[in-house]
Structure formats: structure tokens, C-alpha cells
């Protein structure tokens, strides 16, 4: 089941971020973003347990994914695709024309997923992450369904 991120999910999301990324957006940021009308956060559940989430901003006809993760034991089982497709459909409905994101250049699984979903690399942000790693900036044009 895919639904909006709720206050009760924040602890689980922070734990998943630490587990998967080794860092987190943090409890305070997630709390503050819940009330931001430009922010879009969705979680995906399996048997009433949050196993992943996607979050981003929609503004001026554009979107930006700020975080996307699926618990490692649920990866490569279709959950990420379901969650990602929900973002694309809501983007399309909101009139979003393109979506951008940053991904660590060593995150091969992530890069492959985004490439499979029609994202193209448009630039590199040198030493973008806290650990000094570069970020690949990727973009997807949102196509309208007729």
C-alpha cells in the first residue's frame, strides 16, 4: 500500500535512512517538511510495515526527488517501481514537466534504476556529499499520456 507520509512514520524512515544510506535527513527536517505544501512524501508498506519512501518537491512545473529508498530486504521485488511510478503519476497530474535528482556516483543500483526509468545524467556535483563523494545530477522529462 502506498500512502502519504505521516508523523508516526518518521522514526521508521530515519532508521531506514541510517540503515541504507548511513546518514539521514533527520527527524527535525522530516517533521518540518510534513507541513510544507511544496513537499511530496509517500511511503510504501508491506503487511502494515513501512519498507520505503520517496520524497521531493513540486514547484514551477518541475520536481526534485530528495530521497528515495526501499529497505534492502525488499529491493528488486517491485516495491521501488510501484512507489516510483506513483510519483510519476502524481507529477503528471500536477503538471510537472521534468524531475531531477542527485545520486551518489558509486550507487550503481540507484543509477541503473533511474536509467531504466528514463533519467539522463545532466551534470556532476563535485564533492557534494558529506563523505566527499560526487553526485550525478539526473533528469527525466515527464511525458503526457494521451
Question: Model-derived features: where do they sit?
Answer:
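Acyl-donor (CoA/ACP) binding surface of acyl/acetyltransferases
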Residues: 74-77, 81, 126, 134-136, ...
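Conserved catalytic-core motifs of GNAT/GCN5-like acyltransferases
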Residues: 102, 115, 120-136
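Short Asp/Glu-rich motifs
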Residues: 36, 110, 133-134
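Acetyl-CoA-dependent GNAT
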Residues: 4-73, 84-86, 90, 94, ...
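Short aromatic/hydrophobic contact patches that present stacked aromatics
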Residues: 69, 100-102, 137-139
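Conserved glycine-rich acetyl-CoA-binding loop
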Residues: 49, 71-85, 92-94, 98, ...
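Positions that flank functional sites
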Residues: 32, 106, 129
Amino acid at each position: 500500500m502506498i500512502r502519504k507520509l505521516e508523523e508516526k512514520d518518521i522514526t521508521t524512515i530515519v532508521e531506514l535512512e541510517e540503515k541504507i544510506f548511513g546518514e539521514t535527513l533527520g527527524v527535525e527536517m522530516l517533521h518540518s517538511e510534513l507541513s510544507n505544501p511544496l513537499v511530496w512524501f509517500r511511503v510504501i508498506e508491506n503487511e502494515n510495515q513501512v519498507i520505503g519512501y520517496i520524497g521531493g518537491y513540486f514547484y514551477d512545473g518541475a520536481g526534485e526527488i530528495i530521497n528515495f529508498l526501499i529497505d534492502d530486504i525488499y529491493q528488486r521485488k517491485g516495491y521501488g517501481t510501484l512507489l516510483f511510478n506513483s510519483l510519476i503519476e502524481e507529477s503528471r497530474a500536477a503538471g510537472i514537466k521534468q524531475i531531477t535528482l542527485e545520486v551518489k556516483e558509486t550507487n550503481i543500483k540507484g543509477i541503473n534504476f533511474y536509467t531504466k526509468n528514463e533519467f539522463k545524467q545532466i551534470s556532476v556535483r563535485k564533492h557534494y556529499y558529506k563523505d566527499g563523494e560526487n553526485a550525478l545530477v539526473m533528469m527525466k522529462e515527464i511525458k503526457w499520456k494521451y
